[in-house]
From Swiss-Prot:
GO terms for molecular function: 1-aminocyclopropane-1-carboxylate deaminase activity; D-cysteine desulfhydrase activity; pyridoxal phosphate binding. Its cofactor is pyridoxal 5'-phosphate. Gene3D superfamilies: 3.40.50.1100. The active site is at S79 (nucleophile). The keyword Hydrolase applies. PANTHER family: 1-AMINOCYCLOPROPANE-1-CARBOXYLATE DEAMINASE-RELATED. This is 1-aminocyclopropane-1-carboxylate deaminase. Keywords: Hydrolase, Pyridoxal phosphate. Belongs to the ACC deaminase/D-cysteine desulfhydrase family. It catalyses: 1-aminocyclopropane-1-carboxylate + H2O = 2-oxobutanoate + NH4(+). It comes from Rhizobium leguminosarum bv. viciae.
Length: 339
């Protein structure tokens, strides 16, 4: 029985996302481990999709039931999350206010005019640029935005950064784990490792709960892209505990089942290293799989490096969770002007 059976879901995605073998990337990494990708970057027709839609599917019913008329959320200037909240609001007929903080020390001349923020505005969201820097916690700028909607006579529905510390924020990726388990039956094998980027925490947190039900939570390897490891780990822990209780997992998730690798977040959140850029190019040139410099490029870098170092035993089958994020590339065009 699904852990999610009792929860209402508002469909924003096409359904189960495909799992794709990546033979050319596998070969480029020496062929000792088989690399696959689960394509959550291709999960919806809503504004290029991405992982946040899995989360929002379980949040929207609560938003509608609350009688809200405005979704209010927060992210960085090139936030995938605020793009997805804007898309969701447009789809369900609500207004949208998003705070876009300057989380990233990146100064491309078009950074605040292209990619995610452009699409967010195009979908009618009230996008408010704020100078505050990076922090995955609850932000005053977001609380002020919620209050501003109330002051104008509206009824806001608050969605935190990444939809992560929302009470239903982890449910979507519990569903991801159940979906992978069903697909493994068709594939005829079980993945040895799942690689996923982690920043605000509910994507990996939900996966951990879902795979804990299968006694495989420690095979979910989070690649930190926040650069604030302890804060991220603490938030993942809270999300895991809250989500476990919500879905009646029936046991506590052990500390050793929460695996986060901090080695690839440098030099800062939202700033790619040369190794990140090399990973982005390798995925693009072997598999035409586009990753971004903020999140997926760093998790791709991590997976590539771990494979080359021999972290995965020979013969392992590794599943890369592609969470989306390609629109952000437009804000980093100078890095890739020559490919």
């Amino acid at each position: 029985m699904s852990l999610l059976e009792k929860f209402e879901r508002y469909p924003l995605t096409f359904g189960p996302t495909p799992i794709e073998h990546l033979p050319r990337l596998t070969a480029a990494l020496g062929g000792k481990v088989d690399i696959y990708a689960k394509r959550d970057d291709c999960n919806s027709g809503l504004a290029m999709g991405g992982n946040k839609l899995r989360k929002l599917e379980y949040i929207v019913p609560d938003a509608i039931a609350s009688g809200a008329d405005t979704l209010v959320s927060i992210g960085g200037v090139q936030s995938n999350h605020t793009r997805m909240v804007a898309a969701t609001a447009a789809k369900i007929g609500m207004k949208c206010v998003v705070i876009q903080e300057k989380w990233v020390p990146h100064y491309d001349a078009v950074y605040d005019r292209v990619g995610n923020i452009l699409m967010t505005k195009l979908m009618g969201a009230d996008s408010r640029l704020v100078e505050d820097g990076f922090d995955i916690g609850i932000r005053k700028s977001w609380e002020d935005a919620i209050q501003s909607v109330e002051d104008a006579g509206g009824k806001p529905y608050a969605i935190p950064a990444g939809a992560s510390v929302h009470k239903f924020g982890g449910l979507g990726y519990v569903g991801f784990a159940e979906e992978v388990a069903a697909q493994e039956k068709d594939l005829g094998f079980i993945f040895d490792y799942i690689i996923v980027c982690v920043v605000t925490g509910s994507t990996q947190g939900g996966m951990i709960v879902g795979f804990a039900a299968l006694d495989r939570a420690d095979r979910v390897i989070g690649i930190d892209a926040s650069g604030t490891l302890q804060q991220t780990r603490d938030q993942v822990r809270k999300i895991v505990d809250a989500t476990s209780e919500l879905v009646n997992l029936g046991r506590s998730v052990r500390e050793d089942e929460i695996v986060i690798n901090p080695d690839y977040a440098y030099p800062a959140y939202g700033v790619p290293s040369e190794e990140t850029n090399e990973a982005i190019r390798l995925a693009a040139r072997t598999e035409a799989m586009i990753t971004d410099p903020v999140y997926e490029g760093k998790s791709m870098q991590g997976m590539i490096d771990l494979a080359r170092k021999g972290f995965f035993p020979e013969g392992s089958k590794v599943l890369y969770a592609h969470l989306g994020g390609a629109p952000a590339l437009n804000g980093y065009s100078y890095y890739y002007k020559d490919g």
